[in-house]
């Protein structure tokens, strides 16, 4: 059975990831194309009559005080609060052969950007072990 609190947490986790990715895209455009878009001004615009208006935007706008959202400890605290619910829903979906790509990719994304041990280390270890591609005939 679906735990609706877990489902709400999973949905909230993914919504927050959407905003984080939007902020990072804006920041990248600022750096790469010389745009000068203020994240806090964008949040203000989005919170006032935008189609994506939500209480979450108001919270982010009020709390946004760091240059890089990934440096904001409150954001990661929120992710950690919602993460168990997301994992519960993904576990249930896997056991029932239900694909939830947005949910699973949101979890993968946060795991990749917050992990000290990335999956690329496994790839590098494989390259270190098997990189010569020599066939041992002994």
Where are these regions (language model features)?
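C-terminal amphipathic alpha-helical interaction region
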Residues: 80, 85-138
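C-terminal substrate-binding/catalytic lobe of Rossmann-fold NAD(P)-dependent dehydrogenases
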Residues: 1-94, 100
